[in-house]
Amino acid sequence: MSTRVYPAQVDVAIVGSGPAGATYARILSERASSATIAMFEVGPTVSDPPGAHVKNIADADERAHAQRRSEGPHAREDDDRVGGIVKSAQRRARPGTYLLESGYQADGEDGLPVAAFSSNVGGMAAHWTGACPRPNDSERIGFLDETGELDELLSEGERLLGVTTDAFDASPYAGIVRERLAAVEDAHRDADERVQRMPLAVHRRDDGPLVWSGSDVVLGDITRGNPNFTLFDESLVTRVLVEDGRAAGVVVTDVRTGERRDVRARFVVVAADALRTPQLLWASGIRPDALGRYLNDQAQIVFAVRMRDFTPVVDADGVPQTGLSEYTGVTWVPFTDDMPFHGQVMQLDASPVKLADDDPAAPGSIVGLGLFCAKDLQASDRVAFSDSDVDGYGMPAMQLHYTLSDRDHATIDRAKAEIVRLGKAIGDPLDDRPFVMPLGASLHYQGTVRMGLADDGASVCSPDSEVWGAPGLFVAGNGVIPTATACNPTLTGVALAVRGARHIADEITADLASV
């Protein structure tokens, strides 16, 4: 196998190819096009264009192959895999993800038993549901609201992700689902907090099919066409170089050959997800007090109902038509401080509970409800790293410390009652009781490299996402979010990345102007 040629020096080195890392590449391509950018991704390219969502792969076998190749250092090429979290005590990973093998639960703690990762170009954005709601109430970041920046950054995030609310407008039962939910939920809500269409990173092609956004959409043609941008897949960054207290580049290993190279850089952006970003900083000897702390996930409760008064849509031959979310769309019940959970309602491909053989579900008639709960933030909830043991990539092994507080248990109990109430408004429950997913199932890990206004030991980075005490080093992704959120965090994570990327672009262009 030929040796890969890495650049000796670039202006910006980006670690990770998910939406946040892609945001840095896109903003820099737009605002500082002369800057040389190298993006490093430990996983392989599994879709075309690189970073595209696997849902856009029409062939089912090819799509499954792409998912398997995303499943980490021990990914299999064959069909011998177990996927999909089910209603059991087993630890299982969704297709396209792989579980933390050990260290997911400390003795006497709740842990995150199904904490998971994806290793592929595009990260989890090649496998996600695409929900992009804006944060509300205490989910919002106060110091960015005070400057009037947050909503503009969120709007920019929506542009980059290709967020729409009309992709499912033709869904025959979407309006009915919203009407039934609104009838029991909207009376006590402000107008912008009422039941509504879910903002989604998806659009519908003129010829009909849906196209789901991945990092390919965030990168866009401008980044792919930028001669100064290069994406290196199957490239493991093992250390951030620091000289005279400032980030100076990265050490990268070619996963295919094992060869190691130093790549010098003026700026380093670590966007490796909320667990592997602090892992890389730790491995580099960059260890602020808050690193890995304030880890938070969203407890997830699910419930399924059969829609009342449901008539399947049929084609010209009388055959029922179906497809994920094509009947009922995706409905959003926003988080509020009074109702501290985020609701997502959509058609299920199939019932999560086996129906009687003589009572088959009409295609599209089964609606799934999910409520995501905001976590009670605790500094003791953290990811710690070993100085001796390593993971499958040879990086410091993780140990998660995670405990639900009394407040968390109360929120979950309240959400269980709420989801039954909402479900009964739509249809007839398939099960009397809602199901609490294993902790970690949301995949919405946050807080481990959190943003703050001051270097006070309670945050890792500044509002520009620059790591305290390590100029030139930036962190990106959901781990930067400093608040407890119940909504899907991707849009917020991208919005914060926009601010950091603009800061780097401004520094680069200012330097060029001074020459």
Swiss-Prot record:
The protein's Enzyme Commission number: 1.1.3.50
Annotated segments matching region Disordered: 62-90
Entry keyword set: FAD, Flavoprotein, Oxidoreductase
Enzyme class per UniProt: oxidoreductase
UniProt KW Oxidoreductase keyword: yes
Pfam hit, one: GMC_oxred_C
Active-site residues, record numbering mapped to chain: 444 (proton acceptor)
Catalytic activity: isoorientin + O2 = 3''-dehydroisoorientin + H2O2; mangiferin + O2 = 3'-dehydromangiferin + H2O2
Cofactor or coenzyme needed: FAD
Magnesium in keyword set: no
Residue ranges the record marks as coiled coil: none
UniProt family annotation: Belongs to the GMC oxidoreductase family.
Protein function: FAD-dependent C-glycoside-metabolizing enzyme that participates in the degradation of certain C-glycosides by catalyzing the oxidation of the hydroxyl group at the C3 position of the sugar moiety. Shows oxidase activity toward C-glycosides such as isoorientin and mangiferin but cannot use carminic acid, puerarin, orientin or aloesin. Shows weak activity (100 to 1000-fold lower) with O-glycosides. Probably plays a crucial role in the metabolism of C-glycosides in nature.
Entry protein name: C-glycoside 3-oxidase
Highest classification ranks of the organism: Bacteria, Bacillati, Actinomycetota, Actinomycetes, Micrococcales
